[in-house]
Amino acid sequence: LPDAKILHGDHIRDDVGSTLVVGHDLWTVRNADVVIVNGEEKVGAGTAQEILMAKYFQKPVVCVMPKETHHRKSNLSFNGLLIEDWIHPFLDVSSDYIAPSLEDAVAWVKDYEAGKITTPIKGISVFEKAIEQFESRFPEMVKRYTKP
């Protein structure tokens, strides 16, 4: 990506105060064309919030997450059900593309910029849709969670 500019949080430090740190980081998200997340290691609280806000700002989120990393495991078993390619649910739902490598992420961004990506970019409503699916699939659990 010859015209890409990488923006990161190292230009501002916590000693300026929490509001300015958050303001800086969210400014970079709001003004980005695409948000690329390093999901190779455990994602921190700030990164998780930035991903959420990227959806609020309708930004494409590409998460670089090779197999067998903290948030992506092969052949995981939950309650006796084998999941061949488990991806952390919050990262899976909020990402527009899970890239197995940085090279794959760059290729996706090039395709996106060229108009070759036809899947709509997820917005903040992706979370409301997840809640609706939960309520529809597990009405008895919703009843148990709801006050009488």
Regions found by a protein language model. Give the residues of each.
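Conserved catalytic or regulatory cores that recognize and/or transform ribose-phosphate-containing ligands
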Residues: 1-148
